[in-house]
Regions:
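N-terminal chloroplast transit peptides
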Residues: 4-21
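N-terminal plastid-targeting presequences
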Residues: 26-39, 224
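Membrane-lumen (extracellular) interface motif
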Residues: 34-37, 118-125, 196-202
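Hydrophobic alpha-helical membrane-embedded segments
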Residues: 37-66, 104-114, 127-149
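Membrane-interface amphipathic/juxtamembrane segments adjacent to transmembrane helices
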Residues: 54-93
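Juxtamembrane inter-helical linkers in multi-pass membrane proteins
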Residues: 64-80, 150-172
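Transmembrane alpha-helical segments and their cytosolic interface motifs
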Residues: 88-114, 177-203
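Alpha-helical transmembrane segments and their immediate juxtamembrane interface regions
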Residues: 122-149, 201-224
């Protein structure tokens, strides 16, 4: 799913390039004569996409990350619940997770509805960039909550079957990954917002700042 969403962003960035190339051009400054603004915008989007692809590639090669470590923690948590038959504990924990995810999804959709009304002067591509990030964030948060709800019904039923217990573990891992993606798409909103507020140069700066922030946040937790 992450690859499909990244591909959609790259397509949107390419559309932005074509749209900018087809619009009437004003007299370019000396700096713009060397670096076209649309190229700067596409570079910012490509930088974010490249970072995500590289992180996924490192994880597949065995490197630890926050996302990978937390996914393993979900598996350990499921096994603890099955071993202790802590159904009430599991339901309470899942309820907290469902509440958090649904709150985030509704908040993101509210922000999206409010922001679209304030972007009357922006281009269609800029508005679409903001809306796509917000919708992707809300969707992944809501899907994470859906899987948690499904796991809550399945926990006691799957206790006596090893194959079903493994299926519950996979559901919890997928729920965690969707929650992680929800936050990641919400952070990505900073890139089109910077594009709207400060132009292509600001969007590139925001893209570089986001990758530095992600590089810090994606490190695996280390016991002190």
């Amino acid at each position: 799913m992450m690859k499909r969403l990244i591909t959609a962003c790259l397509i949107a960035a390419a559309h932005a390039l074509l749209h900018a190339a087809s619009t009437p051009r004003r007299v370019a400054t000396r700096r713009e004569a060397y670096i076209p603004p649309q190229a700067v915008t596409v570079a910012g989007a490509a930088n974010l996409a490249f970072y995500q692809l590289q992180m996924s590639r490192r994880e597949r090669r065995g490197a630890d990350s926050w996302r990978k470590t937390q996914a393993a923690a979900r598996v350990d948590w499921c096994r603890h619940v099955f071993a202790t038959e802590g159904w009430l504990y599991a339901v309470q924990t899942l309820r907290n997770g469902i509440t958090a995810n649904t709150f985030q999804a509704s908040t993101v959709l509210t922000l999206g509805g409010l922001s679209v009304g304030q972007l009357k002067q922006a281009s269609h591509v800029q508005v679409a960039s903001v809306v796509c990030c917000l919708v992707a964030s809300a969707y992944t948060f809501s899907q994470s909550a859906r899987l948690m709800l499904h796991a809550g019904f399945w926990f006691p039923v799957a206790a006596g079957d090893a194959q079903q217990r493994a299926a519950v573990e996979k559901i919890m891992v997928r729920s965690h990954r969707l929650q992680w993606m929800g936050w990641r798409w919400l952070y990505h909103v900073a890139w089109p917002v910077a594009w709207l507020a400060g132009g292509p140069a600001a969007s590139l700066g925001a893209s570089l700042a986001l990758t530095l922030f992600f590089a810090r946040e994606d490190r695996a937790p280390v016991a002190s």
